[in-house]
Every structure is written in structure tokens, then in C-alpha cells.
Curated annotation (Swiss-Prot):
Expressed by the venom gland. Belongs to the non-disulfide-bridged peptide (NDBP) superfamily. Medium-length antimicrobial peptide (group 3) family. This is Antimicrobial peptide HsAp3. GO terms for cellular component: extracellular region; membrane; other organism cell membrane. GO terms for biological process: defense response to bacterium; defense response to fungus; killing of cells of another organism. The keyword Signal applies. Possesses antimicrobial activity against both Gram-negative and Gram-positive bacteria, as well as against the fungus C.tropicalis. Also possesses a relatively high hemolytic activity. May act by disrupting the integrity of the bacterial cell membrane. The keyword Secreted applies. Its main location: secreted. It comes from Heterometrus spinifer. Residues 22-33, 69-74 form a propeptide. It is found in: Secreted; Target cell membrane. The modification Proline amide is found at P65.
Length: 74
């Protein structure tokens, strides 16, 4: 009976350690991704907005296919 109890405790301990190791590894991976990006959410958002504005400016200067330039419309 004591052998079964010891075996059960060893297996449960191994399972708990494995689960804890997997959980800590997942948290580290998420943190690493945030560290790698290195830019806060606001900077990324402003970068996206600048990209949209730049495309619009290019489209106004050189008309997009199927559109005329604003200077030609007036």
C-alpha cells in the first residue's frame, strides 16, 4: 500500500511540475513578444494612422486607378 501511495505522490508531483513549467513558459513567451515589439500600443496605433494618411496623400498627388486628381476636378 505504501508503494502505491509513494508512486501516486511521485506521479502527481511530476504532473504538477510539468503543468507549472508549461504555464511559466507560456507567460515568458508572451512577455518576450511584448519586449521584442518594444513599442507601446499608442505608438503602433499612430503608426497605422500615419500609414493611412501617407497612402491618401500619395493618392491625391498621383491619382489612384479610376480616379482623377483633385486639381483636375476643380
Amino acid at each position: 500500500m505504501s508503494r502505491r501511495l509513494i508512486l501516486t505522490l511521485v506521479l502527481v508531483t511530476m504532473l504538477v511540475k510539468t503543468m507549472a513549467g508549461m504555464e511559466s513558459k507560456w507567460v515568458e513567451t508572451t512577455d518576450e513578444i511584448k519586449k521584442r515589439s518594444g513599442t507601446p500600443e499608442k505608438e503602433r496605433e499612430s503608426g497605422r494612422l500615419l500609414g493611412v494618411v501617407k497612402r491618401y496623400i500619395v493618392c491625391v498627388r498621383n491619382p489612384c486607378p479610376g480616379r482623377r486628381a483633385i486639381s483636375e476636378q476643380t
